A protein has these predicted regions:
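Glycine-rich phosphate/diphosphate-binding loop of Rossmann-like nucleotide-binding domains
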Residues: 129-169
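A glycine-rich (often HGG/GG-containing) alpha/beta subdomain
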Residues: 1-67
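Glycine/serine-rich phosphate-binding loop and adjoining beta1-alpha1 elements at the start
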Residues: 40-138
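Short phosphate-engaging motifs
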Residues: 27-28, 72, 148
Length: 169
């Protein structure tokens, strides 16, 4: 789109975020309007330092449903590669995203934020163990074979009487 010098999109099971680099905020907002039309109440707009701080918090797992979850850092990396291959990454985005990945890795290494329950799937399994008398006697259904569904299925495997994974494809 005219006026957009760089663009990056992060899509996970819990979020879709778009970042653009433009010469002025108005051009950036107009570029993003194409993708957020009709999504009243779910859009958050940030500029400059606030957007970098947010991306760092996302990479650290501080904005995740499960604090410190590990999947997000890999998702940021993959989105960075995809945007790079598409020609969307320039010096501003490269600096911001590599900084966010570095801080996310460092936060995990130095704080242990990702110890224990590190995904929504493992949190669900922990809750099921607590709520059900005998998980080994239960049948389990995991809906979806994406990243979270796979993590949940792995966490449940061997702990339930039977495990079924349902997927739309």
């Amino acid at each position: 789109q005219p006026g957009v010098r760089e663009a990056f999109c992060l899509q996970t099971c819990n979020r879709v975020e778009a970042y653009v680099v433009t010469d002025d905020a108005e051009t950036g907002m107009a570029a993003l309007d194409r993708y957020t039309a009709g999504l009243e109440g779910v859009r958050r707009e940030m500029t400059h330092e606030a957007s970098l701080e947010h991306l760092i918090r996302v990479a650290c797992g501080l904005e995740s449903l499960v604090l410190g979850e590990d999947q997000i850092i890999g998702q940021v990396r993959r989105a960075f590669v995809t945007a790079s291959e598409a020609g969307g990454i320039g010096p501003v985005m490269e600096d911001a995203i590599t900084k966010a990945i570095h801080v996310g890795e460092r936060a995990r290494a130095e704080t242990g934020i990702n110890e224990g329950v590190v995904s929504l799937g493992s949190a669900a399994v922990r809750l099921a163990r607590r709520e059900l008398d005998d998980l080994a006697a239960e049948d389990a259904l995991v809906v979806g074979a994406g990243e979270m569904g796979t993590l949940a299925a792995r966490a449940l495997a061997g702990e339930v009487a039977s495990l079924t994974v349902a997927n739309r494809t």
